[in-house]
Amino acid sequence: MMSNGGDSSEIVRELEELKLKKAEIEHRISTLEAKLQDTAAVELYDAVSNGDSYLTAPELEHGLSPDQIYRYSRQLLLPSFAVEGQSNLLKSSVLVIGAGGLGSPALLYLAACGVGQLGIIDHDVVELNNMHRQIIHTEAFIGHPKVKSAAAACRSINSTIKVDEYVEALRTSNALEILSQYDIIVDATDNPPSRYMISDCCVLLGKPLVSGAALGMEGQLTVYNHNGGPCYRCLFPTPPPTSACQRCSDSGVLGVVPGVIGCLQALETIKLASLVGEPLSERMLLFDALSARMRIVKIRGRSSQCTVCGDNSSFNKQTFKDFDYEDFTQFPLFAGPLNLLPAESRISSKEFKEILQKKEQHVLLDVRPSHHYKIVSLPDSLNIPLANLETRLNELTSALKEKGNGHANTESCTNPSVFVVCRRGNDSQRAVQYLRESGFDSAKDIIGGLEAWAANVNPNFPTY
């Protein structure tokens, strides 16, 4: 035992001596490397002082630095792009409106390829359900402004470009001032009022607009207001019906679809900025993810009768500032709760919880689409999608009769009650309006829908 102890002590002592020698050797290596660098610097200085200019960085007519030549070398090697394209790109400025599914890939590629000045505007914060498609963000930025997250990502890719941050919503009150600072505008938003507003502003400022859209399994892309081409209003003088306008958060999107369109938005922007290639003006690219098919269609040219860019248009900057785009499109700029019903036609999620606890007779009608209902639902609920409610009222009547032991009356349906739920409390209000008009006087909306249930009653209830 003693000899083993002695052996251990000897090993420890020898190990410490070796560690000390290692530290001394590493210190000596660092010292010699520093001296070598100093010697090389002195030799270079002496050579330059003696007129040996071949050792200095050459003065290049195109103005690109050695670092820029190396960073962008793979682009410089392209005959169709070359030095001229890169120089134009470095002098350009681009504003990307929206740092979401479309803006994420567009921003990353624009930063990487060397756009000189890159602006990012978005009022929203990063959420977990952004991760599958908004690839510029990471989980570390959840709860933080998207602009801050996107700007950090762009700077981490290319620290040599200027990145401007606008943590605010784009409105008529600030759009002219912000957009006027950039050469090219990229619309990466997802709602009609923003599209009209951005296009109108670009017309007033004479800016080309790279516009993309992605929803579900489809996407599209075009360039407006370029070389005499049309603006958004030329194609859509009248807003589409609100039933045809949906956001990704409502209808869903496969993450890679906005990724494809966002990359193509970056490409069109690079073509505009570098003066290389043929931008998608007066043409529209359509992408179908399910068939992996892309096609380009001809779209109508600029309309001389357009109320904004037409020959006799009286639309000006003051008109723009005073214009109500939400009223024009009948669509909100930002997704939020509707308020369609009087207070007596609504109950809170906590009040509905009390009804369940008291075991009061009722029918819980879930008016979400059936594929939403399959994701998650409250127990003992009846699923009739809002779009089918009119043709399937008999199912609700049957459910009421069953709950009321055959005493429910289809004329009044006062007992038991009908409580209507949806995802966020908007479609349920529309359903209650229709039900009350149809004689179901006891119908009430559950305020805030399933999201409110998860927030106020059951934190373990999944949201999506």
From Swiss-Prot:
Query: What does the UniProt cofactor note say?
Result: Binds 1 zinc ion per subunit.
What chemistry does it catalyse, as a reaction equation?
[molybdopterin-synthase sulfur-carrier protein]-C-terminal Gly-Gly + ATP + H(+) = [molybdopterin-synthase sulfur-carrier protein]-C-terminal Gly-Gly-AMP + diphosphate; [molybdopterin-synthase sulfur-carrier protein]-C-terminal Gly-Gly-AMP + S-sulfanyl-L-cysteinyl-[cysteine desulfurase] + AH2 = [molybdopterin-synthase sulfur-carrier protein]-C-terminal-Gly-aminoethanethioate + L-cysteinyl-[cysteine desulfurase] + A + AMP + 2 H(+)
Report a single Gene Ontology molecular function.
ubiquitin-like modifier activating enzyme activity
**Which keywords describe this protein according to UniProt?**
ATP-binding, Cytoplasm, Metal-binding, Molybdenum cofactor biosynthesis, Multifunctional enzyme, Nucleotide-binding, Transferase, tRNA processing, Zinc
* Residues that, per the record, bind ATP: G101, D122, N129, N130, M131, H132, R133, K146, D190, N191
Q: Name what cofactor the protein needs.
A: Zn(2+)
Q: What is its EC number?
A: 2.7.7.80, 2.8.1.11
Where in the cell does this protein reside? Cytoplasm
Q: Where does Zn(2+) bind?
A: C231, C234, C306, C309
Q: In which pathway does it act?
A: tRNA modification; 5-methoxycarbonylmethyl-2-thiouridine-tRNA biosynthesis; Cofactor biosynthesis; molybdopterin biosynthesis
* Positions of the catalytic residues: C248 (glycyl thioester intermediate), C422 (cysteine persulfide intermediate)
**Which GO CC annotations does the UniProt entry carry?**
cytosol
Quick check: keyword tRNA processing in the entry? yes
Domain Rhodanese, first and last residues per copy = 358-462
The kind of enzyme this is, by top-level EC class, is transferase
Q: Give the chief site where it resides.
A: cytoplasm
One GO BP annotation is: Mo-molybdopterin cofactor biosynthetic process
Protein family according to the UniProt entry: In the N-terminal section; belongs to the HesA/MoeB/ThiF family. UBA4 subfamily.
- Tell me which NCBIfam families the record gives: PRK05690.1
Q: What does this protein do?
A: Plays a central role in 2-thiolation of mcm(5)S(2)U at tRNA wobble positions of cytosolic tRNA(Lys), tRNA(Glu) and tRNA(Gln). Also essential during biosynthesis of the molybdenum cofactor. Acts by mediating the C-terminal thiocarboxylation of sulfur carriers URM1 and MOCS2A. Its N-terminus first activates URM1 and MOCS2A as acyl-adenylates (-COAMP), then the persulfide sulfur on the catalytic cysteine is transferred to URM1 and MOCS2A to form thiocarboxylation (-COSH) of their C-terminus.
Q: Report what the protein is called.
A: Adenylyltransferase and sulfurtransferase MOCS3
